[in-house]
């Protein structure tokens, strides 16, 4: 088979990316700084059948995107994201599931590298370090407060060693190696493209429970505001009905006018002892349940003690 020319390879890449763009509407935009070929192969294997990863030169990616603007106009929003060491993950399955698979393939087997941009803040906790006093001057040069306790260096307070977005310095990398603290390297999912909508990948961390909780709080706030201002809304309907019923009861409790639910309330007001007598057996039964369970436990414990004594006598 003849070797493909540079132009042929470029054309094949553009055709492949064009095909994927038209086929998939959900894309994860990823960055692969400090990711080795073996680790990348592991990610591809884990995503097989669920998603397709495509890396490439940024110029080729832009060329392919621009060629498909007429067929898929919404992909124009991807153009500003084509920068640095990035690529696309074209997703068939749920985006959150794909992202979790990618995160599971992170590796922490390599020490921190000089000049690498820190993706997160790095803190050193206070406490014993296991380092001998000869390292005191090195730690003090980094502005770390220490003291010697039982022949080893102890850090006095939390140390913000590296800030997110900053480059790892030689001193910071050396200190992390001394503490045997290795950073996690892996494919970094940064942005989501969902059928023309672009949003931060952190949105995928939001669960259905989080949404329901926020919605419930919002409804409660609307209901409280509606009650305070006297403006009736759907959120305040339950409260309005309860208040209206209370007003009706207060108005007709001493009159001859009644309705089915009011009859029950009037009977309760006229003869509260009768309702108390009905409620008493039920409450008494509930109160007796813990006592019965406790008595049963005592009996079981006594039986166990007897059995244990008999067993001891047999083998003594």
From Swiss-Prot:
Basic and acidic residues: compositionally biased ranges: 286-299
Keyword Ribosomal protein: yes
Region span, Disordered: 282-316
Subunit structure: P0 forms a pentameric complex by interaction with dimers of P1 and P2.
Protein name per its UniProtKB record: Large ribosomal subunit protein uL10
Chain's role: Ribosomal protein P0 is the functional equivalent of E.coli protein L10.
Keyword vocabulary terms for this entry: Phosphoprotein, Ribonucleoprotein, Ribosomal protein
């Amino acid at each position: 088979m003849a070797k493909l020319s540079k132009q042929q390879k470029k054309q094949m890449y553009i055709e492949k990316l064009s095909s994927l763009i038209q086929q998939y509407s959900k894309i994860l935009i990823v960055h692969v700084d400090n990711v080795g070929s073996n680790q990348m192969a592991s990610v591809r294997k884990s995503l097989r059948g669920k998603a397709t990863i495509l890396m490439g030169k940024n110029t080729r990616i832009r060329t392919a995107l621009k060629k498909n603007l007429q067929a898929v106009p919404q992909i124009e929003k991807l153009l500003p994201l084509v920068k640095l060491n990035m690529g696309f993950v074209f997703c068939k399955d749920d985006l959150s599931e794909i992202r979790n698979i990618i995160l599971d393939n992170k590796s922490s087997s390599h020490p921190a590298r000089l000049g690498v941009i820190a993706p997160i803040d790095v803190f050193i906790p206070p406490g014993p370090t296991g380092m001998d006093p000869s390292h005191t001057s090195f730690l003090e040069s980094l502005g770390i407060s220490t003291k010697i306790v039982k022949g080893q260096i102890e850090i006095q307070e939390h140390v913000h060693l590296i800030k997110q977005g900053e480059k790892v310095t030689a001193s910071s990398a050396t200190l992390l190696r001394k503490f045997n603290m290795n950073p996690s390297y892996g494919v970094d999912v940064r942005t989501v493209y969902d059928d023309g909508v672009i949003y931060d990948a952190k949105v995928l961390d939001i669960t259905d429970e989080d949404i329901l909780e926020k919605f419930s709080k919002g409804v409660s706030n609307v209901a409280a505001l509606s009650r305070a201002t006297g403006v009736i809304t759907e959120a305040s309907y339950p409260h309005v009905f309860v208040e209206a019923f209370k007003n009706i009861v207060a108005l007709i409790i001493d009159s001859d006018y009644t309705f089915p639910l009011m009859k029950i309330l009037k009977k309760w007001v006229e003869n509260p002892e009768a309702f108390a007598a009905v409620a008493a057996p039920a409450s008494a039964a509930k109160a007796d349940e813990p006592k019965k369970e406790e008595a049963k436990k005592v009996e079981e414990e006594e039986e166990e003690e007897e059995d244990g004594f008999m067993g001891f006598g047999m083998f003594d």
